[in-house]
Regions:
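Feature for exported/extracytoplasmic and membrane-associated proteins, marking the mature portion
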Residues: 1-352, 356-363, 383, 399, ...
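Histidine-centered active-site microenvironments of extracellular/periplasmic hydrolases
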Residues: 376-409
């Protein structure tokens, strides 16, 4: 069933006229900008399937208690800065060294990290340790938004541009997801989707959002298709009285629709709504055809999202796609206090969900063709503010998949310090790897032509390399035939 073009024409007409609602109901620019559709640029789609899955950890994950120094010397520095949990003044947030023994990541013999540091994962992440040991997971050290390479001296002098509004949740979420300032209308996942549209029979299913609204999947042409753990999310803006997240816009639309059957807006809306229902039925029928044996457990919001992503990948043949970008998320990571315990539990959810998803890709025969990576607003201070940590900048993240050169570290390990040249105060890491370098490396694997990388990663020309090296060379992917 080909349904990738018709709804776009109706979407354009409907949203063009919904400019009336912007004046009457203050509909968001994000929603209205979905109208700007264009032809996809040339893309190296190859002959098989590939997908990228972004796991966004909202709130700013505390990387210091996610990937922890384990060797004696660096652990001692870490514990001295963070304080021992359970100390008399209750100011400690350092994890106990003995609790890390089962999650130590062995540094490859041909790698030497800064100060000979050895890392361990949080105790609640044993499954990611197993993936690292098997070569399916790689940590990317001290990555964050940068406009250009930046040293501490340049930061202090203000001689090199830096991202705007550092340490701010909304601004840095947008900057991470778009490689542009807060207010950007496209994200780098959506811009990859723009390039990949021509590879898919049904272009609507190129970018799929299994969580709330985010700029990451919005392109100039690509429009995020919304799903929930239960399947397709039907478009019915009047059901809850909030069109484009605006009650006034919803009321304005209701008034227009009641104005008579000859109203052109009403006709557009009716056609658009009918198409949305067709899409929902089509997606849900495709999902019902899927048999997935991998267990994702219960009571894990992230696992629920990744389960439906796995089901959609299993249905890729019926959906008519060979390239897809997905977004899932988990919130609750803004630990200004109560870090010990709460943070461990959240990391346990990430560990369980990402592992289950990887095992599902193995079951489906696409482990080499699906790459999952974590992201977050920012890292956090290495120093404790009592029983938590404050907003930072650079952080450590994970890349998972059969196409990953796992079992080794990428990027540059920072010193365990609050006054070294690779931090900007209180142990806030100054990134040594940019988000643009991360997105460019993923983009090359995904099929983005080198000449098109600046459209995905706008700052990449300022950095030494567009390929950090954590992905294996592109190979013929598994064909999307099932």
């Amino acid at each position: 069933m080909f349904i990738g073009k018709g709804i776009e024409i109706e979407r354009r007409a409907f949203l063009r006229r919904s400019g009336q609602l912007a004046m009457m109901g203050a509909a968001s620019s994000y929603a209205l900008d979905l109208a700007g559709l264009a032809e996809a640029a040339a893309f190296n789609g190859g002959g098989g399937y590939k997908a990228l899955v972004c796991v966004f950890l909202y709130g700013g994950n505390d990387h210091g208690n996610t990937l922890i120094p384990f060797d004696q010397a660096n652990y001692a520095r870490y514990a001295a800065i963070r304080g021992t949990a359970g100390s008399e003044d209750a100011s400690g947030i350092a994890l106990g060294r003995s609790a890390l023994a089962n999650t130590v990541l062995a540094t490859p013999s041909d790698q030497r990290l800064t100060d000979d540091i050895t890392y361990a994962l949080a105790p609640t992440m044993p499954r990611l340790k197993t993936l690292f040991d098997s070569g399916a997971m790689a940590p990317l050290l001290n990555v964050g938004p940068l406009i250009a390479p930046l040293t501490r001296a340049q930061y202090d002098a203000g001689s090199v541009p830096r991202p705007a509004k550092l340490f701010s949740h909304n601004d840095q979420q947008s900057t991470w997801q778009s490689s542009q300032p807060e207010g950007s209308r496209t994200g780098w996942g959506g811009r990859m989707g723009d390039l990949a549209l021509s590879s898919n029979t049904n272009a609507m299913f190129t970018a799929i959002n299994a969580t709330g609204n985010a700029v990451f999947l919005s392109g100039q042409t690509a429009v995020p298709y919304q799903v929930s753990p239960a399947g397709a999310t039907l478009y019915n803006p009047l059901q809850n009285g909030r069109l484009f997240n605006s009650a006034a816009a919803s009321q304005a639309l209701s008034t227009l629709l009641r104005s008579g059957s000859g109203n052109v807006m009403a006709a557009d809306y009716a056609r658009f709504n009918d198409r949305s229902i067709q899409y929902g039925a089509f997606v849900n029928d495709a999902l019902r055809s899927v048999t997935l044996c991998t267990s994702f457990g219960t009571g894990n919001r992230l696992a629920d999202q990744l389960r439906v992503v796995a089901q959609l990948i299993a249905a890729r043949g019926r959906l008519g796609v060979t390239r897809q970008v997905f977004l899932v998320s988990l919130g609750g990571f803004d630990h200004h206090d109560g870090l010990i315990g709460s943070h461990d539990a959240l990391l346990g959810q990430v560990d369980s969900a990402v592992d289950a998803f990887y095992r599902a890709t193995v079951e489906l025969g696409v482990a080499d063709n699906v790459t999952t990576f974590t992201a977050s607003d920012f890292g956090r201070t290495l120093s404790s503010n009592g029983d938590g940590s404050d907003h930072g900048w650079g952080a450590h993240h994970f890349i998972v998949g059969g196409g990953v050169r796992g079992g080794r570290f990428y990027g540059r390990a920072p010193q365990v310090s609050v006054n070294s040249a690779d931090q900007v105060g209180q142990g806030r890491l100054l990134p040594t790897t940019s988000v643009d370098e991360l997105s460019a490396t993923l983009g090359l694997w995904f099929g983005v032509a080198p000449s098109e990388l600046p459209s995905v990663a706008p700052n990449i020309g300022r950095f030494a390399s567009a390929d950090i090296g954590f992905m294996k060379p592109a190979q013929t992917a598994v064909a999307a035939t099932r």
